[in-house]
């Protein structure tokens, strides 16, 4: 608990500068790699302000990719009365998910998207060209030191080439088309040091499978990861892409590798190939017949390598994780969970029979992956009773694999080919797992029902292990793998240091003169009684039951009546009582209203935006938690519900009011929602302070993340749609 005197200069603990408790940054504040990239793309900042983890910022990304979901984004864009794109060079359309679907309905949808791209001059890649994430890297949209977003959860993929990639929702994509920008809260940043060197037969896929299994207690949940360490230089770029891609399954919102000489050499190879081709976009006349690629060219590469973006010495990280690569053996993820990772040797006895094997997806279907599988299967056949499906990450990858002879090797072994696209990875098309079947895949997700029947079992592994398993009919490694030569450790060596919880309270000077002014119309203070739901991982279904989700005619008043129904049936009545008893605001700049407090990962689960609007309609203008689910956060702020993170406040509330001093058991009084009698809470929007008035007890003030200017802009315009209309 931190008591902060009300002085012109405030003294707070050093840990309050972490992702959830920072007040502001000064010119001299060291920045991480992620913060530096965001700094380049943040717009509307006051002069001299440096962004930090926890800040809400308005971002103008280099590019935004949409895939088959471009159709709904077009509908949202048109519903905003938009007639033209803010910057036609910013969006990229790549059709990749349902490419096996030749139905009239799907083909009509694809043609509509292509026509929209042609009308507005947007780069368009048709079905069969490849998976969007592969294309974004392959065609140079993702680039070292840049920031690229996509309406797909595996946008983390771009971090493999030193590009900050993160996912957005469809409404954000429409907003970017219209205004060129979107809001983002810079996540807490975790450093992951990969040390040593992998043994022969161990791959980048084994690295990320092991990381997700070893650090499976939400250590990187909703964080941005920066990979460092001596082992990075020994990882191929394809391996880095695999690792970055699956940081999504690990729980992170981004995973970025450094820009180094190995990346430079890789791009030089790409450029040599590019010189042999002409560059034709089917929708952009300016590139037709061009001799120099608009993105993949020597001048651009020289600029990226000369002006490399690197973290500052002394930059702050919420945590530091490490993994000794030299102690790692091949690992398998599952069954049906990426949080379960087992060393391959432990799965050999008793053998695990399989029915299907897959070498598909943006995770592991590049030319090097196909070559690895071909090396295992050369001269062999897929085992009787096993179906082995292959699909290249892109048509260009398939061309390279065909030229090398690897594609034909897999076909000769009995592999069944699929078009370049997502296919079985997303549970679409032929070859899905059926009830009772077991599959092993080089993809990124093995959640129950993801690749077919919910009554099937799915494992994840490297391309070599998948190919070997297809040949043997059981999960195994290649014949060339000598288990006795692998590192002999019970488990890989790893460690974690939580910097944010270090507890060393060095005073930090915060100058009032450096505070940014609030936008006109945004409340300087939020004030009112508090409700505390002592629960972690409170789902959106708990906030707004699924049975109401598709009642499109439901009123705001009715939403308020059912809010939190699945968590606490009495919550709505409690909130109504507090709302009707609210006193007059203490000042014109104060917005009165009950304030909801809860635990960590508040709003996990379904993406239903009614979870946010129901809370707001219940008269709760602001929610304070330890952390929030990322999609819930976006839905809330897009609809004008303010969210603030203050771990220290939640810690004290838990100790005082939660049963047994821990969350997830309800309150000490037996109620699921605690309303401390006589207590009031006041949030200072500009300073990032939360003051709790405990009735007859002393006031306590806690650090919290400030309400950023980007969030203020949305709020004063009534939400994202109002902001977009005001920006046109």
Swiss-Prot record:
| Gene3D superfamilies assigned to the protein according to its UniProt record, in alphabetical order | Aconitase, domain 3, Aconitase, domain 4
Source domain of life: Eukaryota
What Enzyme Commission number(s) does the record list for this chain?
4.2.1.36
- Which NCBIfam families is this protein grouped with? h_aconitase
Keyword field contains Transferase:
no
Which residues does the annotated transit peptide occupy? 1-24
Question: Which residues make up the binding site for [4Fe-4S] cluster?
Answer: 362, 422, 425
Q: Which family does it belong to?
A: Belongs to the aconitase/IPM isomerase family.
**Subcellular location, record wording:** Mitochondrion
**What is this protein's record name?**
Homoaconitase, mitochondrial
Which pathway does this chain act in? Amino-acid biosynthesis; L-lysine biosynthesis via AAA pathway; L-alpha-aminoadipate from 2-oxoglutarate: step 3/5
InterPro entries with a match to the protein in the record: Acnase/IPM_dHydase_lsu_aba_1/3 (IPR015931), Acoase/IPM_deHydtase_lsu_aba (IPR001030), Aconitase/3IPM_dehydase_swvl (IPR015928), Aconitase_4Fe-4S_BS (IPR018136), Aconitase_4Fe-4S_dom (IPR036008), AconitaseA/IPMdHydase_ssu_swvl (IPR000573), Homoaconitase_mito (IPR004418), IPM_dehydratase_rel_enz (IPR050067)
Q: How is the cofactor bound?
A: Binds 1 [4Fe-4S] cluster per subunit.
As its record notes, the protein acts as a catalyst of: (2R,3S)-homoisocitrate = cis-homoaconitate + H2O
By its UniProt entry, which Pfam families does this protein fall under? Aconitase, Aconitase_C
């Amino acid at each position: 608990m931190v008591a902060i005197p009300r002085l012109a200069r405030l003294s707070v603990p050093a840990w309050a500068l972490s992702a959830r408790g920072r007040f502001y940054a000064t010119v001299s504040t060291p920045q991480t790699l992620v913060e530096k990239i965001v700094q380049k793309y943040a717009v509307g900042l006051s002069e001299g302000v440096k962004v930090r983890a926890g800040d809400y910022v308005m971002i103008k990304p280099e590019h935004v990719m949409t895939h088959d979901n471009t159709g709904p984004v077009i509908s949202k864009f048109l519903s905003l009365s938009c007639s033209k794109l803010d910057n036609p060079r910013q969006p990229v359309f790549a059709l990749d998910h349902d490419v096996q679907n030749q139905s009239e309905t799907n083909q009509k949808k694809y043609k509509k998207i292509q026509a929209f791209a042609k009308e507005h001059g947007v780069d368009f890649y048709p079905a069969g060209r490849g998976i969007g994430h592969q294309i974004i890297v392959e065609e140079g949209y993702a680039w070292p030191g840049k920031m690229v977003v996509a309406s797909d959860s595996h946008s983390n993929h771009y971090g493999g080439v030193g590009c900050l990639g993160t996912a957005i929702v469809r409404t954000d994509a429409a907003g970017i088309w219209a205004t060129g920008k979107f809001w983002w809260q810079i996540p807490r940043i975790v450093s992951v040091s990969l040390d040593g060197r992998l043994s022969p037969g161990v791959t980048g896929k084994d690295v990320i499978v092991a990381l997700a299994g070893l650090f499976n207690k939400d250590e990187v949940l909703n964080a941005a990861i920066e990979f460092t360490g001596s082992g990075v230089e020994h990882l191929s770029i394809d391996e880095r892409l695999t690792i970055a891609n699956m940081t999504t399954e690990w729980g992170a919102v981004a995973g970025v590798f450094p820009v180094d000489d190995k990346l430079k050499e890789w791009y030089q190879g790409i450029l040599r190939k590019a010189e042999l081709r002409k560059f034709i976009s089917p929708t952009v006349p300016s590139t037709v017949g061009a001799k120099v690629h608009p993105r993949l060219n020597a001048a651009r590469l020289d600029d990226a390598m000369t002006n490399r973006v690197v973290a500052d010495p002394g930059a702050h990280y919420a945590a530091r994780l490490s993994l000794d690569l030299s102690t790692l053996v091949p690992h398998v993820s599952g069954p049906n969970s990426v949080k379960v990772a087992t060393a391959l040797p432990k799965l050999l006895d008793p053998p695990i029979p399989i029915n299907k094997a897959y070498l598909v997806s943006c995770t592991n279907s590049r030319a090097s992956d196909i070559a690895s599988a071909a090396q295992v299967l050369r001269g062999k056949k897929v085992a009787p009773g096993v179906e082995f499906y292959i699909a290249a990450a892109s048509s260009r990858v398939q061309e390279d694999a065909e030229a090398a002879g690897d594609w034909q090797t897999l076909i000769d072994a009995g592999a069944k080919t699929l078009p370049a696209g997502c296919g079985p990875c997303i549970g679409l098309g032929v070859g899905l797992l059926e009830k009772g079947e077991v599959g092993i895949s080089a993809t990124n997700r093995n959640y129950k029902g993801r690749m077919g029947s919910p009554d099937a079992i799915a494992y994840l592994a490297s391309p070599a292990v998948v190919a070997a398993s297809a040949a043997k009919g059981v999960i195994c490694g290649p014949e060339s793998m000598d288990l006795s030569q692998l590192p002999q450790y019970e488990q890989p060596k790893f460690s974690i240091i939580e910097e944010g919880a270090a507890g060393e309270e060095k005073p930090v000077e915060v100058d009032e003169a450096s505070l940014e002014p609030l936008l006109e119309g945004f409340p300087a203070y939020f004030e009112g009684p508090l409700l505390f739901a002592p629960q972690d991982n409170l789902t959106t279904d708990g906030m707004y039951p699924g049975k109401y989700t598709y009642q499109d005619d439901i009123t705001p008043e009715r939403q308020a009546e059912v809010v939190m129904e699945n968590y606490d049936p009495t919550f709505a009545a409690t909130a109504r009582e507090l709302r009707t008893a609210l006193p007059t605001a203490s000042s014109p700049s104060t917005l009165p209203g009950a304030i909801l407090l809860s635990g960590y990962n508040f709003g996990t689960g379904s993406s239903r935006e009614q979870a946010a609007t129901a809370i707001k309609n219940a008269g709760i203008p602001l929610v304070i938690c330890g952390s929030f689910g990322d999609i819930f956060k976006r839905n809330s702020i897009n609809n004008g519900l303010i969210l603030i993170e203050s771990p220290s406040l939640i810690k004290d509330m838990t100790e005082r009011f939660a049963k047994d001093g821990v969350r997830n058991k309800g309150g000490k009084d037996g109620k699921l929602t605690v309303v401390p009698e006589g207590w009031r809470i006041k949030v200072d929007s500009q300073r990032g302070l939360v003051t709790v008035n405990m009735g007859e007890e002393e006031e306590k003030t806690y650090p919290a993340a400030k309400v950023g200017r980007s969030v203020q802009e949305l709020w004063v315009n009534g939400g994202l749609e109002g902001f977009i209309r005001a920006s046109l």
